Amino acid sequence: VLRNAVIRLRNLYRLRRSLQRLNPDLVFFACLDDMLPTLAPLWLFNLLLPYQWSGLLVQSALPPYHRGMPDTRPFLRSKNCVGVGILNEYSAKGLETFQRHILLFPDFADLSAPATNYPLLRKLKERARGRKVISLLGSINFRKGIKLLLESIPLLPKDEYFFLIAGKSSLTAQQENDLRAFGESRNNCLFSLEKIPDESCFNALIAESDLIFAAYKQFTGSSNLLTKAAAFRKPVIVSRGLCMGRRVEQYG
């Protein structure tokens, strides 16, 4: 905890030295989460960042605040902060204690026309052969609910449903081997643990899917996967209660 706090303060010091040459009227941080300190007196933070600033707080739904514990939110009270943007509208009320000017940002998504010549798309069509396609897409890790999906696959008729997992993996080598072995043992699975080349290819997989699996574990943030699912009119499975679940219940 202390090491992380020191690293963040050191980064702010370096940033201040870089900004001195520019003397900006306003500094905007595209990911404020990585810039705010976790442990420091507020006067020191104001000294290190003496310019008016704002930014996007990507993960804005945080655990309850406890005074004296490492937390970025008290630094939103800085006299130089002119406002904070968030993606998760349900977290706004909890942040108003620290900053009155909270702005809701849309979670933009690239809706480029689906690629028609993507090799993985052709392979999916060949393997699925008309079955309903359930897809888990994007960065592949166990926070994305892979375990739940794998437990569900044997419970559904394999002649009716086909399962796609595609995206860049952050699993261990053993986890990847286990996942591939599971997929290869069944005729209704296609697992590709490589990065999806671009948004057109990503959208092609969305368009070919019948259901998007997004039941992430303890994920409190927003995801533009909901935007893509809505744009391509695909139903989506999400975890109940948090941001994505509340949006689906409210608008779905």
Regions found by a protein language model. Give the residues of each.
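Short N-terminal targeting/anchoring amphipathic segment
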Residues: R3-R8, L15-T38, S54
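Active-site proximal beta-strand in glycosyltransferases
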Residues: L26-C31, L42-P63, G85
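Donor nucleotide-sugar binding/catalytic pocket of nucleotide-sugar-dependent glycosyltransferases
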Residues: S54-P63, P74-R122
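Conserved donor-binding/catalytic core segment of Leloir-type glycosyltransferases
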Residues: L124-K144, L150-I153, F163-I165
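Nucleotide-activated donor-binding/catalytic signature segment of Leloir-type glycosyltransferases, i.e.
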Residues: R131, Q175-S200, A204, E208, ...
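Glycosyltransferase donor-sugar binding loop
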Residues: L137, F162-N177, K195
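Acidic donor-binding loop of glycosyltransferase active sites
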Residues: A204-G221
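Short hydrophobic beta-strand element within catalytic cores of glycosyltransferases
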Residues: L211-I212, P235-S239
